[in-house]
């Protein structure tokens, strides 16, 4: 019924509760959350990385100037279509400020973790 979801290892698509999608460098990160079972504190989730597809687009035909852009992986679009069917997701306008703040907080955590990792590596060199 959901061939693209099963192709990435999701065996029980009917247990999917929601999903999130974000872009990180040259990848799209899909996180799928499953319904929480009785007695569990946290819902189970799985994360997938999809490399963005690179494409050269003609910017100026006179100078034959090209610009490289990235776009969402075609397989990922099929997976999202199936997830939308399952979650009956309503495509509503997301508060842009809330999204930017969320992305900023995530970036802060990633950078903080990376700084700690680099500092630990420096300590090993002393």
Curated annotation (Swiss-Prot):
InterPro entries: UPF0325. Pfam families: DUF3461. It comes from the Bacteria. Disulfide bonds: none annotated. Belongs to the UPF0325 family. This is UPF0325 protein PBPRA2971. It comes from Photobacterium profundum (strain SS9). The lineage of its organism: Bacteria, Pseudomonadati, Pseudomonadota, Gammaproteobacteria, Vibrionales.
């Amino acid at each position: 019924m959901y061939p693209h979801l099963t192709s990435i290892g999701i065996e029980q698509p009917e247990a999917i509760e929601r999903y999130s999608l974000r872009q990180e460098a040259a990848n799209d990160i899909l996180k799928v959350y499953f319904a929480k079972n009785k007695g569990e504190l946290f819902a189970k989730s799985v994360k997938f990385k999809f490399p963005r597809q690179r494409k050269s687009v003609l910017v100026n035909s006179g100078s034959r100037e090209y610009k490289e852009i990235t776009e969402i992986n075609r397989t990922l679009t099929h997976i999202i279509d199936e997830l939308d069917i399952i979650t009956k997701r309503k495509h509503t306008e997301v508060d842009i400020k809330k999204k930017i703040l969320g992305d900023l907080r995530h970036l802060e955590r990633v950078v903080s973790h990376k700084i700690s990792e680099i500092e630990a590596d420096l300590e090993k060199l002393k």
